[in-house]
From Swiss-Prot:
Keywords: Cell cycle, Cell division, Chromosome partition, Cytoplasm, DNA integration, DNA recombination, DNA-binding. This is Tyrosine recombinase XerD. Forms a cyclic heterotetrameric complex composed of two molecules of XerC and two molecules of XerD. Belongs to the 'phage' integrase family. XerD subfamily. Gene3D superfamilies: 1.10.150.130, Intergrase catalytic core (1.10.443.10). Site-specific tyrosine recombinase, which acts by catalyzing the cutting and rejoining of the recombining DNA molecules. The XerC-XerD complex is essential to convert dimers of the bacterial chromosome into monomers to permit their segregation at cell division. It also contributes to the segregational stability of plasmids. It is found in: Cytoplasm. One of its GO terms (molecular function) is DNA binding. Coiled coil: none annotated. It comes from the Bacteria. GO terms for cellular component: cytoplasm. The active site is at R167, K191, H270, R273, H296, Y305 (o-(3'-phospho-dna)-tyrosine intermediate). Its main location: cytoplasm.
Length: 324
């Protein structure tokens, strides 16, 4: 079975009927409440919105308003998604969104029960995070041409992402005020508004300094860089003085990977974060320290990287031990 690509899912969504006003209002109220209560990021809220609007459009009022749907209606929708080749991981995420949404509906008094709790939750496999080798990382980081302001900016972004293990959303939204060059640290606001301090190595500080002194003024054409809608001045900008998008950064990484002979389908912004974690563990980093650097709420999320490190040790043993 071939799973649907992102573009195919978007095209399918456009074929669905328009959102009913009552459902649109319900979704908006729920997202506002989630933002106030949990401080969810814009990216997470947009994901919630897409999932809830997808269900609402599919239902189109047939089984009643969105907030009143029953377990059979939800099961019908999940069955339809499976027939449309949505991935098990995507459907598992939808179940999580539905639990949150209907819990909010109960809090608001729109219903007395949470129908999503009656849905079966299949056990999903936990694929190991993909990481590049250290030599591949070195080649990828050196791929941008530093002769142009854009290339120098991209080099600094790649260096920073790998040095600090940032999520791509954290990188592109990073305010300049969160960089402390004197102490060589970043203050990162991660998922759920959780803050963490991340130290920077000499190499990433070198490229950041070059970006700030050479590329950033050139990209801004020496104009003052305005604050965004959140009141923050972005660290990384384009020629329109705006922060960069995740999609732009994704395309650049694919392009640079192809330039240095790495299969583009094996590279994504998150692969740099996985590589950061894997390489630290391979060199003896403490798991609790890695948890803090990555900004994970639970140590169990961080522990998956130990499996990759264990594989690395097994490979070394097999290659170099006389009885390997």
């Amino acid at each position: 079975m071939t799973l649907r690509t992102t573009n195919q899912r978007r095209q399918l969504a456009r074929q669905q009927p328009p959102l009913l006003p009552e459902d649109a209002t319900t979704i908006a109220h729920c997202l506002d409440a989630l933002w106030i209560k949990h401080g969810l990021s814009r990216h997470t809220l947009n994901s919630y919105r897409r999932d809830l609007e997808g269900l609402a459009r599919w239902n189109n009022g047939r089984a009643g308003p969105l907030a009143t749907l029953t377990p059979p209606a939800l099961l019908d929708y999940l069955t339809w998604r499976t027939q449309q080749h949505y991935s098990p991981l995507s459907n598992a995420r939808l179940r999580s969104v539905l639990r949150t949404f209907f819990s909010y509906a109960v809090e608001c008094g729109w219903r007395n029960d949470n129908p999503s709790t009656l849905l079966a939750h299949p056990v999903l496999p936990h694929p190991l995070p993909k990481a590049l080798t250290e030599s591949q990382i070195e080649a990828l980081l050196a791929a941008p041409s530093i002769e142009t302001p854009e290339g120098l900016r991209n080099r600094a972004m790649l260096e920073l992402m790998y040095a600090a293990g940032l999520r791509v959303s954290e990188l592109v939204t990073l305010p300049v005020a969160m960089l402390n060059q004197r102490q060589g640290v970043l203050r990162i606001t991660g998922k759920g508004g959780k803050e963490r301090l991340v130290p920077l190595g000499e190499e990433s500080q070198h490229w950041l300094q070059r970006y700030l002194e050479q590329a950033r003024p050139s990209l801004a054409a020496d104009k003052p860089i305005p604050a965004d809608s959140d009141g923050d001045v972005p660290l990384f900008i384009n020629t329109n003085l705006k922060r960069l998008s995740r999609q732009q950064f994704w395309r650049w990484i694919k392009h640079y990977a192809a330039l240095v002979g790495i299969a583009p389908n094996k590279v994504s912004p998150h692969v740099l974060r996985h590589s950061f974690a894997t390489h630290l563990l391979n060199h003896g980093a403490d798991l609790r320290a890695l948890q803090m650097l990555l900004g994970h709420r639970s140590i169990s999320t961080t522990q998956i990287y130990t499996l990759i490190a264990r594989q690395h040790l097994q490979q070394l043993h097999a290659q170099h031990h006389p009885r390997g």
